[in-house]
């Protein structure tokens, strides 16, 4: 069966079992039951509680909750074993660490819920774009109905300003133009017609933007009027297909999520293995299989679990991302999904829509031929666009460009019309591609005719040359067409204007009577100009190893011209159309996309295919756009970038990031910020894991030697207080000098890539050695002669614990200074991180407070230490800086080789 746009109006009406007068009310009610209301499906709403539970699926949080549960259980069991009367303080002290862990879990979950993207907002935004009311023919009469009541077979009346309520076939047309940019990406409104369309040779389908006898839900009538018979409603419309594609596109994890999930799994296996080993080792070594002995051994294992898990990591990552989001929003990049920030940092391809993204979405006259003032005034008068009170042109975009052209030359449309009022016209018709207006001037009449250069020139018998009317010769005709071709080669849309003078008002206003024996005045070439800042932004993208790609619904010539101007491509061989794309299989497409930088005349499904092909090439892909047509591909991309000003609500709600200023250059800033944030998160991760490594090795080694280095609550304090503040401060480091001159990182690189794993291990060992040394010195101060034997016998030393706690805290505080750069010497960094200095001082004061405030010292089980011990701890801890600086020096030397 022939497609609707290939059928005549009679065939379409017959196929839908309707007439040009519309359906009867009774028949419409039957069809409403059959097809359902003309609206888009609503997405399933996710409750706040369900969103909260989804946050708790994070592996890191699961490990923390298990650790909290085990700690709580052992504390309660241990408390129940105490003789009566039991000391409630023992229970409270044991549950402190449980409470701290649960607060961390709760905080992360709440932050996740607040930041989480609301998927159903996309469908709701699509619904708001559909017309609320529409004019429908029912029982042969025009009635106003809610758009949801429309059914296939209904005949709707469309006028300028109306939103098209459903997909339809045009059956009556009076110079109607429909703006379809949101669906097709083409900025110029489409001149509609009623004739059936035919396929050209080798064509299997007519692209959406070329179906001139069709109209689609979500588009807007900008000129003329007409009637259309509804062919599809609701989810069967083109808009509905987009909504359905959005619903079917599955969410993928960002690289950071994958890395943190991987880290969570590694830590869970590590914790399980170490805990089982220590539990078994202690039981066998001590030979104490009583409940008390088992619980004591179990608490040692819990200590190791607490030591192994960086409790502050999830919070630090979330807060660093949140701070980055705030900073980006101040630069007009609004992040809608928290973990998507770092995805920008490894973006390798940016697929960008043209209209409104790379260009201004504002047709502008950029070149003219002939007397510029006369051409401008004539074209402004021969148009239906007008200037509002703010001198902004309103109307069809092409005519707005002509009115603005005259205005820039000092000729306002209203002033021109006051001097030469319009008295008659022959409206534009897509068949003849012209329009004419007749104006009264000084007791006579002048007619202006504008349209396509070929059709206007064919009706000219003379031309204006140096203010004189001279006969049109073949030589002059060739000159005019050469000027037209020169403009067209630049992808300009060219219009011609001519005039005819009358001593009396023409008796006939038919085109056949008016549009002959014309005097050619000139040409005007217009284009949707590029945004002035985009070219520099694209150069910066290339410098950062990112490939920009243009994907548009516009014509190939226009797209190529814009892309060449911006530096996206070098020649037309790097451009391909949607029709040509259809001939390439999904299997071959990933290889083909590498060849092209411009995709023209594409439809929504093409955009999704292109983005998917780049992803199959293992390239982290971003997609920018503003129209509804961009929404599925934006959601398919690793990171979708919507436009805040010109963007539709559906695009903004699907996007991971929205550019508040619609500025392509903001993407470059966002990419740099994404790289900075990821670099800083790696610094924080390295710092926290090195700290945890030192705790694990210290507790593990001390257990093997027969004494307790630190208790779980001590480790939690270090992890959540001493470490967290410097880690957060590291997340606020300024970008390093090479941030935007190095290639994007490989998204497959693990969290320990680039030598981070080695750094964590050696730095963890370094802090362990320093901490154990401090513990042993403290124990020797407590036990005096033969201190090691006494320590083994006692199994612990309050003095040693105090020294270990102080030294480990100081060591990690000083180590945070090292972490300002993974490879560069911190003494060569030009920027100053004042927040880090404050964090280091704050952590040091809090650590000292625990040791010096009596009730805290008692609660933590510490002994009072003097200035000598403080001096020893400081001397030991500060050695971490020169040692790490020396290793960095060696690493830089190796890297150069």
Language model feature labels by segment:
Residues 694-695, 759-771:
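Core segments of transmembrane alpha-helices
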Residues 722, 799-816:
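Generic alpha-helical transmembrane segments
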Residues 703-711, 777-799:
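Helix-coil boundary and interhelical linker segments in multi-pass alpha-helical membrane proteins
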Residues 746-765, 791-803:
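Membrane-water interface at loop-to-transmembrane-helix junctions
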Residues 819:
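A C-terminal functional module that forms or caps the active site or interfaces directly
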Residues 1-744, 749-752, 765, 805, ...:
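Conserved cytosolic headpiece of P-type ATPases
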Residues 79-80, 772-787, 852-857:
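Membrane-helix interface motif
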């Amino acid at each position: 069966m022939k497609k609707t746009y290939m059928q005549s109006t009679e065939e379409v009406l017959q196929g839908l079992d309707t007439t040009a007068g519309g359906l009867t009310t009774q028949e419409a009610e039957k069809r409403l039951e059959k097809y359902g209301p003309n609206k888009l499906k609503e997405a399933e709403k996710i409750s706040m509680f369900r969103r909260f539970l989804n946050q708790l699926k994070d592996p890191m949080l699961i490990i923390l909750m298990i650790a909290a549960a085990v700690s709580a259980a052992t504390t309660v069991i241990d408390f129940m074993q105490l003789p009566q009367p039991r000391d409630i303080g023992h229970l409270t002290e044991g549950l402190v660490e449980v409470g701290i862990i649960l607060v961390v879990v709760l905080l992360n979950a709440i932050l996740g819920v607040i930041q989480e993207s609301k998927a159903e907002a996309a469908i709701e935004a699509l619904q708001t774009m559909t017309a609320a009311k529409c004019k429908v023919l029912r029982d042969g009469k025009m009635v106003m109905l809610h758009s949801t009541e429309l059914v296939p077979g209904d005949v709707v009346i469309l006028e300028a300003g109306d939103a098209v309520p459903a997909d339809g076939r045009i059956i009556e047309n009076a110079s109607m133009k429909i703006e379809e940019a949101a669906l097709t990406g083409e900025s110029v409104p489409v001149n509609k017609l009623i004739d059936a369309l035919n396929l050209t040779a080798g064509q299997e389908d007519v692209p959406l933007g070329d179906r001139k006898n069709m109209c689609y839900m979500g588009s807007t009538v900008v000129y003329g009027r007409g009637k259309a018979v509804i062919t599809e409603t609701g989810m069967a419309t083109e808009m509905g297909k987009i909504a359905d594609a959005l619903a079917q596109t599955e969410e993928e994890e960002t690289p950071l999520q994958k890395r943190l999930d991987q880290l969570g799994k590694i830590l869970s296996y590590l914790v399980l293995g170490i805990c089982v080993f220590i539990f078994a080792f202690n039981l066998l070594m001590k030979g104490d299989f009583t409940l008390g002995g088992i619980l004591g051994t179990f608490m040692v294992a819990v200590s190791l679990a607490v030591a192994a898990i960086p409790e502050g990591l999830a919070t630090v990552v979330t807060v660093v991302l949140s701070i980055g989001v705030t900073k980006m929003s101040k630069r007009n990049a609004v992040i809608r999904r928290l973990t998507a920030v770092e995805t920008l940092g490894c973006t390798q391809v940016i697929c960008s829509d043209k209209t409104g993204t790379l260009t201004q979405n504002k047709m502008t006259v950029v070149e003219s031929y002939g007397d510029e003032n006369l051409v401008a005034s004539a074209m402004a008068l021969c148009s239906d666009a007008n200037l509002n009170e703010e001198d902004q042109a309103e109307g069809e975009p092409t005519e707005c460009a002509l009115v603005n052209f005259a205005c820039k030359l000092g000729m306002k449309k209203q002033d021109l019309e006051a001097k030469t009022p319009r008295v008659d016209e022959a409206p534009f018709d897509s068949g003849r591609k012209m329009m004419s207006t007749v104006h009264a001037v000084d007791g006579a009449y002048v007619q202006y005719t504008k349209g396509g250069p070929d059709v206007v020139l064919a009706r000219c018998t003379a031309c204006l040359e140096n203010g004189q009317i001279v006969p049109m010769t073949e030589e002059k005709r060739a000159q005019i067409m050469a000027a037209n071709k020169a403009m067209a080669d630049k992808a300009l849309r060219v219009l011609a204007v001519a005039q005819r003078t009358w001593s009396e008002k023409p008796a006939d206003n038919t085109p056949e009577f008016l549009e002959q024996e014309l005097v050619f005045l000139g040409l005007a070439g217009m284009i949707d100009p590029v945004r002035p800042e985009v070219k520099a932004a694209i150069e910066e993208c290339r410098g950062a190893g990112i490939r920009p790609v243009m994907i548009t619904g516009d014509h190939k010539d226009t797209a190529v011209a814009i892309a060449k101007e911006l530096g996206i491509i070098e020649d037309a061989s790097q451009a391909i159309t949607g029709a040509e794309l259809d001939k390439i299989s999904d299997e071959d497409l990933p290889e083909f996309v590498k060849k092209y930088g411009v995709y023209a005349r594409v439809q929504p499904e093409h955009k999704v295919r292109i983005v998917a092909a780049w992803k199959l090439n293992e390239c982290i892909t971003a997609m920018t756009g503003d129209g509804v047509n961009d929404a599925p591909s934006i959601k398919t991309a690793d990171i979708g970038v919507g436009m805040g000003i010109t963007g539709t609500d559906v695009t903004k709600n699907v996007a991971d990031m929205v550019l508040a200023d619609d500025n392509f250059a903001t993407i470059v800033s966002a990419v740099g910020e994404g790289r900075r944030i990821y670099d800083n998160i790696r610094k924080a991760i390295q710092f926290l894991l090195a700290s945890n490594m030192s705790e694990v090795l210290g507790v593990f080694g001390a257990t093997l030697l027969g004494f307790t280095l630190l208790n779980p609550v001590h480790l939690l304090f270090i992890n959540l207080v001493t470490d967290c503040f410097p880690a957060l401060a590291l997340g606020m480091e300024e970008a390093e000098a090479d941030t935007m001159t190095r290639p994007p990182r490989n998204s497959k690189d693990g969290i320990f890539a680039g030598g981070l794993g080695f750094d964590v291990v050696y730095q963890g060992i370094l802090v362990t050695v320093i901490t154990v040394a401090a513990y042993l010195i403290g124990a020797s101060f407590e036990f005096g002669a033969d201190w090691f034997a006494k320590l083994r016998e006692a199994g612990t030393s309050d003095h040693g614990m105090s020294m270990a706690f102080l030294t480990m805290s100081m060591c990690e505080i000083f180590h945070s200074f090292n972490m300002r750069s993974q490879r560069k010497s911190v003494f060569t960094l030009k920027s100053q991180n004042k927040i880090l200095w404050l964090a280091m001082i704050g952590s040091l004061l809090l650590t000292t407070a625990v040791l010096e405030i009596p009730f805290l010292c008692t609660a933590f089980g510490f002994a009072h230490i003097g200035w000598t011990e403080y001096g020893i701890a400081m001397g030991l801890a500060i050695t971490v800086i020169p040692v790490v600086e020396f290793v960095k020096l060696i690493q830089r030397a190796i890297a150069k080789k």
